[in-house]
Every structure is written in structure tokens, then in C-alpha cells.
């Protein structure tokens, strides 16, 4: 029999979404009545299938308030409740990266006096056993202080801090992210089964576990966990004395890396693994929207990412019952490991992200091409990432048309003689060139699609002309079509020109 309680995402110090009907939900005994009240509002429902959910009317920003939830025998009381803005922070390690580990993080923790940002960290565990539910009971919302905020998402914190200051309300962040995860890990089996390309993510797992006993798979995974713990200790030793060491040198010292481990039910790194255990543990908590930073792990299937990402957005909108739910996401920055060739797979992920922005309603894209670090997949400066997400939200969600949220974004191409002329959206204020080498990163090709490095000049009408001596009849242009390269071209607002290619059918 289910115990009478509210879902773990409800606790003292929580933030409820302003100016939207607010869902409050939990578990209980079938047939019993549940009454939820806060600041003069009351809602009543009856438990069915050991679950209950009430909807409170929209409320204006304010607080602190007290929420009471009663079944007639027990009363749950949550204090210090604020009504403001609530955003879910989804994605993988660059969203997960903690405030204590970002550039300047220790100073922010010591000196910030942020009273109007709060955080709920969704438990990271895909194994929904008795321990899962015991541990979940110990989760709860926290207010900012130098200790509790150490593990907050740095990106989400900087985003929320600016948003709270601008709107004058408390902002709550629901952290729902995990490093090394594919978008497919955060989706349901049903959503992936709808499409042949997406079903491949399920097939990876289904084929790996076919014909194997649970006992055998659990032992294999737990053996891996022990190995990985020792391997990580050795890797810290190695990089402390070889900061510029290569991956091959690291493995020669530590042994072969087995990350992310065998694909088993206990391993969170497989399709659907985090949907029930994380997404559905906080859904349908009423939120304003989603901020999202992910895509690195999906570079093994970059040509499928547009379809995968679009399906994730639609699934989450369906789950939250809001087909207009805002989705502000980060386009991947520059990145390449020193030992790797330029596979250009991140180019395809970035292109899929821009295509998502251009074709999926109520989305925003934070271009952070200039925020990458060579040989480091986790750039430490998260302030500009949070800031550019904030700009996107102000522009798309909060209706501030004066906010310059974009750098220039490719619009179209015409050809004049031996020059390709590129026009841009969001380029009314013009361009800035940074560095001593002028504009770099453009390439041009003829009908043969053999790209050559190109010169680029800014025209008086705000277009950019691109040309190369070897290409007399330009047919295609691409810009910063590389996993890692110098970023020299920006809008006047300091946001870089987004990477592009003029033909998505060009596979070379």
C-alpha cells in the first residue's frame, strides 16, 4: 500500500511557477481525499491507483508561503515556498558541471549573495529499487549558500541569477542531467519505437542483453564499477604528472578504459535508462520551460540527431501537457581532443541543433562557438553560456524584443561572378572581427564539392562575399565546418556568427 506523501520534488524552499495552473501530486491510499492549500487557494482530489494530483489556480509571484497537504489523518507542511519562475535544466556533463568546479566558482560561492535562486537536484540513479526510493525521500529544494550551491549546475545558476535579477522574482531550477548521456537515455521506449532510425538506440541495448540472465549482467556491471573506481584514481595520478598526456599514454599507465561499461540494466548509459528514474520523477511539476545542453555523446550518430532531438522535445512537451513548452538549448562549442583527427561529427550536431531551432516552435539556441577549449570537452567558463541562454529566454519567452539574443545566422547565398555572397539574419548592427588574422574559417567549393580555403570580405550592404582563386564558379560555402578552429567573426553584441554550410545535402 502506497504511503501518503507528496512527490519528492515538493519540499520546503520550493519554487512554484507563477501565472500558470500548478499541479501538485503524490501517492496515497485508494479512495482517501487529499486537500492541498496555499496562500488562500485550495484544491481537493481523491486517490486512485495509489496516486493523486490536484491543480491549483494560477498565482502571482510572491512568498514566502506555507503549503499544507492533508488526507484528514496526516498533514504535510512545506515552508518558505516561493512563487516565481521554474526551469528544468536538462542535458549531460556540461549542464551538470558544478558551480564549485567552474571558472571562478569558488569566488562565486564565497561572495555571491543570491537570495532569489533555488535548486532541486533530481536523484541520479536508474535502478528503482528500495534504496532508490529511500534516497529520493532525502532530496529537496535548497536555497543558495556556499555549501548547498557547490553541486548546483553552473550553467543553470548563471542563467537563473540573471533571470531573477531581471524579472524581480525567485527562480527555481530543477536539475535533471547526467554526464555522458545521449538524448535517447531521457526518452521512453514508445517514443523511440515510432521511427526506424530511432529504434536503433533501443536495438543497441536489446541486442546487448538478449539471452543473458539478470544475475549475470548485474555481476558484470558491479565488477566494472570496481574496475572503473581504480582506473579513475590512476588517471588522476597520471594527469597530475602528465598534464599534456595523450589518451593512449593515459591508457598505457592506467590500463584500458572500459568506460562507459557493459550495457546492462544497472548501467545508466543506455536508451530509456533515465526516463522513468529521473524525467518522470519530476514530471509533471509545473515549469516555465527547459534549458538544455547536450549532444556530445550523440556524435556517434550525428546524422540522426535532428530526428532524435526533435522527438525528445515533443515527448517532454507531451509529458508536461504543454505543446508550447519553451525549450532553450545550447549549440555545441568548438572541441577536439589533441590526438583525434577532425572527424567533423560535431559540425553535424551543431547543424542539427540550428535546424531544430529553425523548424521547431518555441525553441531558442544559444550559440557558444567561442566558448570551447582545445583538448577539453568540459569548458570551465560557464558564465557566457548561462548569459546567452538568458538572452534567448528573454527574447523568445519573456517577449523582450529589444534584447539582442543572437549573433548573425546564415540566411541565404547568391552568386555574383566568382564570388558567393552570403546574407544573414540578426546582422543589422554589423560584424566585429577579432584577432590579427582577419576573417578565417570560410571555405568555398564548385559543383565538384571540393572545398578550398576562402577569403571573406564584409560588403557595404551587410552581406559577406566569399571567394577563392581555385574556385571560379562557386556553388557551396561553409563556415567553421570543423570540430575545432579559431572563431574570428562576431556580431556587434559579442555573439559569434553561427557555423553553417549552404547545402545540407553536401556530405563531404
Locations of the language-model features?
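Cell-envelope and extracellular/periplasmic
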Residues: 1-508
Amino acid at each position: 500500500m502506497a504511503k501518503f506523501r507528496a512527490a519528492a520534488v515538493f519540499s520546503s524552499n520550493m519554487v512554484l511557477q507563477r501565472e500558470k495552473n500548478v499541479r501538485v501530486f503524490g501517492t496515497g491510499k485508494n479512495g482517501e481525499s487529499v486537500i492541498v492549500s496555499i496562500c488562500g487557494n485550495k484544491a481537493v482530489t481523491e486517490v486512485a491507483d495509489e496516486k493523486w494530483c490536484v491543480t491549483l489556480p494560477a498565482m502571482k509571484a510572491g512568498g514566502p508561503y506555507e503549503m499544507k497537504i492533508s488526507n484528514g489523518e496526516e498533514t504535510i507542511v512545506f515552508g518558505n515556498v516561493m512563487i516565481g519562475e521554474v526551469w528544468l535544466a536538462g542535458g549531460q556533463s556540461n549542464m551538470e558541471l558544478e558551480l564549485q568546479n567552474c571558472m571562478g566558482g569558488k569566488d562565486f560561492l564565497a561572495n555571491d549573495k543570491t537570495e532569489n535562486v533555488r535548486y532541486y537536484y533530481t536523484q541520479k540513479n536508474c535502478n528503482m529499487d528500495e534504496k532508490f526510493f529511500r534516497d529520493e525521500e532525502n532530496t529537496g529544494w535548497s536555497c543558495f549558500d556556499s555549501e548547498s550551491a557547490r553541486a548546483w549546475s553552473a550553467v543553470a545558476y548563471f542563467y537563473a541569477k540573471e533571470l531573477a535579477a531581471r524579472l524581480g522574482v525567485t527562480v527555481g531550477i530543477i536539475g535533471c542531467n547526467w554526464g555522458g548521456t545521449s538524448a535517447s537515455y531521457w526518452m521512453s521506449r514508445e517514443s523511440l519505437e515510432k521511427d526506424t532510425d530511432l529504434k536503433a538506440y533501443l536495438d543497441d541495448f536489446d541486442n546487448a542483453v538478449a539471452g543473458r540472465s539478470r544475475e549475470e549482467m548485474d555481476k558484470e556491471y558491479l565488477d566494472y564499477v570496481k574496475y572503473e573506481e581504480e582506473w579513475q584514481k590512476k588517471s588522476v595520478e597520471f594527469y597530475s604528472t602528465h598534464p599534456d598526456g595523450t589518451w593512449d599514454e593515459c591508457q598505457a599507465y592506467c590500463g584500458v578504459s572500459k568506460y562507459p561499461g557493459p550495457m546492462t540494466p544497472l548501467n545508466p548509459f543506455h536508451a530509456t535508462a533515465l526516463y522513468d528514474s529521473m524525467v518522470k520523477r519530476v514530471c509533471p511539476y509545473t515549469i516555465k520551460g527547459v534549458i538544455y545542453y547536450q549532444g556530445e555523446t550523440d556524435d556517434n550518430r550525428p546524422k540522426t540527431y535532428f530526428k532524435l532531438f526533435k522527438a525528445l522535445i515533443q515527448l517532454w512537451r507531451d509529458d508536461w501537457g504543454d505543446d508550447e513548452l519553451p525549450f532553450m538549448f545550447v549549440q555545441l562549442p568548438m572541441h577536439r581532443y589533441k590526438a583525434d583527427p577532425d572527424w567533423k561529427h560535431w559540425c553535424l550536431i551543431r547543424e542539427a541543433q540550428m535546424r531544430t531551432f529553425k523548424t521547431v516552435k518555441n525553441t531558442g539556441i544559444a550559440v557558444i562557438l567561442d566558448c570551447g577549449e582545445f583538448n577539453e570537452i568540459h569548458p570551465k567558463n560557464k558564465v557566457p553560456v548561462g548569459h546567452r541562454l538568458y538572452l534567448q529566454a528573454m527574447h523568445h519567452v519573456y517577449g523582450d524584443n529589444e534584447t539582442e539574443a543572437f549573433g548573425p545566422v546564415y540566411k541565404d547565398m547568391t552568386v555574383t561572378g566568382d564570388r558567393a555572397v552570403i546574407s544573414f539574419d540578426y546582422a543589422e548592427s554589423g560584424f566585429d572581427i577579432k584577432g590579427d588574422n582577419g576573417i578565417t574559417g570560410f571555405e568555398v567549393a564548385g559543383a565538384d564539392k571540393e572545398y578550398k580555403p576562402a577569403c571573406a570580405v564584409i560588403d557595404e550592404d551587410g552581406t559577406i562575399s566569399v571567394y577563392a582563386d581555385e574556385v571560379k564558379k562557386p556553388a557551396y560555402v561553409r563556415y567553421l565546418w570543423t570540430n575545432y578552429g579559431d572563431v574570428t567573426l562576431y556580431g556587434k553584441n559579442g555573439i559569434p556568427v553561427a557555423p553553417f554550410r549552404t547545402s545540407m545535402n553536401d556530405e563531404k
